[in-house]
Structures are given as structure tokens and as C-alpha cells.
Design a protein with these regions (language model features):
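A short alpha-helical cap/connector motif
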Residues: 1-220
Length: 220
């Protein structure tokens, strides 16, 4: 029997209120705008009954994955992957706006080229419910292939550029289990990220889905 619409609405409202509270808890540890942050949590909740790790590629201060941990609970393994040295150089494939961004420290989203410290990420995770946390420092091409070969329930990509996004997809996407999810932060913002996702999804014949301004892929 279908769930009555009013029950669905009440459940959504309850989650929305809770997720906004989670945003307030971590807002100093994330660059993501409140609506997008809450949207990420709504999507993350869809994998609540899917077993596997949570991996974030491009974690900055850890505020997004910490919020996800509060939604998905303490029993999973959470991996925070970042250079903690800022973004690598943008390439031609990333587009003119990306090249302009990386030389413009007046941009409100610049944050020293997206540089954060491991301690800031640990601080965010210490406030979360997560018990099993791994901080993985280094460039994706040097670190992602070294992660333990465990199933992934949720893979979140926030690497901005083509090469970073492509590396994460080629290295980790095949380990995302059925009904698991890939969330892509920059799909509607950076050309290179869009291209990397489109290429990989086409190769796999995976439909690209959208919730507001959030791009995601649900693994068949």
C-alpha cells in the first residue's frame, strides 16, 4: 500500500528540520551553501540501509562528511581524502573560469585555493557520531588506489577539476555497491568536472540524476 502523501510530507519536514540543525553544527567547516548542504543530507539518507563505507574525495575542513556521518551513523568507515595543500593546477579542459579562479584570491570561494588542515577535518569529525575515521592526506592519484578494498555505500566527489574527478571515478566508482550513490559537488559549476562525470557515466551507461542543483548517480 502506498504511503499516504501527508505521511511522506511529515517525514520530509522532520528530516529537513534535523538536517538544517546539522548544517548549523558544521557551517564553519564547509563552503557548501545551506540548501545544497541539506540536499546532500537528504540524498545521503537514501543509502541508510545500504552497507558500505563513505568516502569523500575533496573534504576541505570536513563539514560535509561530518554531517553525513550524523545521518548515516557511527558504524561505517568514513574516509576523508584531500591534499590538505589546496587544489592542483587547473588545466585547459577545466575552462577559462577555472583558470581565472585559481589566480583570484579576492574570490569569496577562494579560501587560499581551498586549503584546509587535517586538524580542521579531525575537529569536524570529532563533533560527529563517526567512530571509524581515516584522514587520507595526499593527491588523489597517489592515495585513492591505496584505500582498503571494501564496499562503498556513498562516494562524494568534490575535487573540482577534470583530472581529480576522473581519477576518483576510475579508481573508486566500481566499488560503489548496488543502490549505493555517487554525489558530485561541482557538476553544475566547473566544466572539467562536468566532462569527467559525463564521460564516465556514458561509459557505464549510468543515468545522471539531479536534485535541485545537486548531481548524483544511483548505482543499479
Amino acid at each position: 500500500m502506498p504511503i499516504p502523501t501527508f505521511v511522506q510530507a511529515a517525514r520530509f519536514a522532520t528530516n529537513e528540520f534535523r538536517f538544517r540543525q546539522i548544517y548549523q553544527k558544521y557551517k564553519t567547516h564547509t563552503m557548501i551553501d545551506p540548501a545544497l548542504y541539506v540536499g546532500n543530507l537528504h540524498l545521503a539518507k537514501r543509502v541508510a540501509n545500504v552497507e558500505g563505507a563513505v568516502i569523500e574525495c575533496g573534504t576541505w575542513r570536513g563539514g560535509m562528511i561530518a554531517g553525513i556521518a550524523d545521518v548515516l551513523g557511527p558504524e561505517r568507515h568514513y574516509y576523508l581524502c584531500d591534499s590538505f595543500e589546496g587544489l592542483p593546477a587547473a588545466e585547459q579542459v577545466d575552462g577559462a573560469n577555472a583558470k581565472k579562479y585559481e589566480v583570484d584570491p579576492t574570490n569569496p570561494w577562494y579560501h587560499n585555493n581551498c586549503t584546509a588542515s587535517e586538524d580542521e577535518a579531525r575537529e569536524a569529525m570529532a563533533k560527529s557520531t563517526a567512530k571509524n575515521v581515516s584522514i587520507v592526506k595526499g593527491w588523489f592519484e597517489n592515495t585513492l588506489a591505496t584505500l582498503p578494498q571494501e564496499p562503498i555505500a556513498l562516494l562524494r566527489l568534490d575535487g573540482d577539476w577534470y583530472s581529480s574527478t576522473k581519477c576518483a571515478l576510475e579508481t573508486l566508482a566500481d566499488r560503489v555497491v548496488s543502490r549505493g550513490m555517487i554525489l558530485i559537488d561541482d557538476y553544475y559549476f566547473w566544466e572539467g568536472c562536468t566532462m569527467a562525470v559525463n564521460e564516465y557515466a556514458a561509459q557505464k551507461k549510468w543515468p545522471i540524476q539531479q536534485l535541485g542543483k545537486i548531481c548524483y548517480i544511483t548505482i543499479p
